[in-house]
Amino acid sequence: AKTQKLYPTPAAFEKDMPNMLRKLGWSPERASYIASKIQVDPARGSGHAAGAQMKGDKARLRTRITDKGMNYKGYNIAVHEFGHNVEQTIDLYDIDYYMLQGVPNTAFTEALAFLFQKRDLDLLGIKENNPDKEHLASLDAIWSCYEIMGVSLLDMQVWKWLYANPDATPAQLKEAVIRLAKEVWNL
């Protein structure tokens, strides 16, 4: 696999980070600056991003690399975590008041990480030529939202039912949950 050849070690991924940032639009100087503040460490699990807590420390990108190198799954996760580290680094070093470190918030850092992850193939020089790519991405986004919303909608309906039926038995609750789930999911 291409990723295994490119990234046989955590150090190889770390060395390529400025190049990845340039491909994502950062100037060479800015890319080198940001990447110099991120250290890549091996992980037993899938990966994790831990931001530095004070200037002078490095953010840590933990990623799994096997003895055969980084497989695509590990690469995809590492690119996502790299997005977190970039946000954490900018967030720490480019603010004028330390107490604002960590702001905006988790939703913002996740959005940036997913932007990085979405471009993982571009970073490898692999172009997706599927003419349906945008349409499929839209369907994926709609389904992902519906999966989250569907669970929430069901929770709300079950709680409304529970308040309306405070003396319900477990069997009645089960029956109501199944009926409500069908109503929510079969819209």
Residue ranges: model-predicted function:
Residues 56-65, 155-156:
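Glycine-rich, often proline-containing surface loops adjacent to acidic residues and nearby aromatics
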